[in-house]
Amino acid sequence: RPGRLDVKIKLDRPDAAAAAEILARYLDGRTPLTTGGVDAAEFRRGLIDAIVERLYARSDANRFIEVTYAGGDREVLHVADFVSGAMLAGIVGRAKKAAIKELIGGGERGLRHDHVLSACAAEIAENEELPNTTNPDDWARISGRKGERIVFLRTLVGSRALNPS
């Protein structure tokens, strides 16, 4: 179409600081909160910190997949290695939807920590299907890893193994 630009721009996955900035755009001053008497700005910052901490912790709970490279080296990738702006938007959207459903059901108005933590868990669970591709080239593209070819994938969520060969 005239005037349309078909330019692809590669963006790296956000680190924890960038994720916090992205989340601040979605959890702005217009988002109703159930603060329990805490300053709204401080509470909002706490929600953002809770999401970032849940996604970026290099803990056993966040181990996502183990890749084996052609040279035999192995690497464990965590949830943080797959975070995207879309995932962050999805978490906030899920949390807001949960808060709205609760309000409609007679609950309190506003977003709470349990809403965002449940939304994180749901978004991570949905993304557990991500490694189901068996093409190593697709996998390298999805994970954003460059360099040596991936020859074997083992999901650490549900202990399934995928062999791309």
Q: Each predicted region: which residue ranges?
A:
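A generic structural signal for secondary-structure junctions
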Residues: 1, 24-28, 121
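Conserved C-terminal "switch" segment of AAA+ ATPases
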Residues: 12-87, 97-106
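Glycine-rich loops and low-complexity Gly/Arg-rich segments
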Residues: 9-12, 32-37, 136, 140-144
